Amino acid sequence: NSILTTFERNQSVKYVYLFGNGAADGTAKMKNTLGGKGANLAEMNHLGIPVPPGFTITTEVCSYYYDNDKKLPDSLDSQLKDALLQTENIMGSKFGYADDPLLVSIRSGARQSMPGMMETVLNVGLTSETIPGLIKKTGNDRFVYDAYRRLIMMYADVVMEKAAGLEPEDGVGIRHKLESLIENHKSTNQYVNDTDLSGEDWKELSEIFKDEIRNTLGADFPD
């Protein structure tokens, strides 16, 4: 092993562990590698508990990232694509496919339990191209646009602001600004609860969110 190049070692390391359909690459004993959440998801599959399929990126990727000038392992991209393909096969839908899009949640985890400290981004896979297909499939435009605005809010907060290391403008984070826009919209339309908003309301707010993100963070929400 000592004569292997860094590239060769990188290619041979397993960075992505699959779970789903009652099988899993990992086990409950692998919390140091998969984090507590990833290890438990693997174990639940081994126990036959119905769990939506997915995959866990190992804690080693985080260590590699910080040990290598914030660069990711070369083989991670291909391993992720393979894991996503296998997840698509189990679910019977495809990520980014306009007619029947696969949506995924991205949940952070750690070797030690940290309740309330870890971030989550839901509904990844919803875009202007995939929204019509999901509306057609569900027959519920309110559900879809509500899910889309949640994606926009979480992605802007977790990825575009916090992960990018941006300081909140005037001490007010982007998530708080977007939540204020919802309250303003409710007040203008004499709504009391979020449940009063229609699909058209959430659609309109989604576009308003994008403008606010551009103005506040100086970047476009990726569609």
State where each predicted segment sits.
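Nucleotide/phosphate-binding sheet-loop regions of phosphoryl- and nucleotidyl-transfer enzymes
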Residues: 3-223
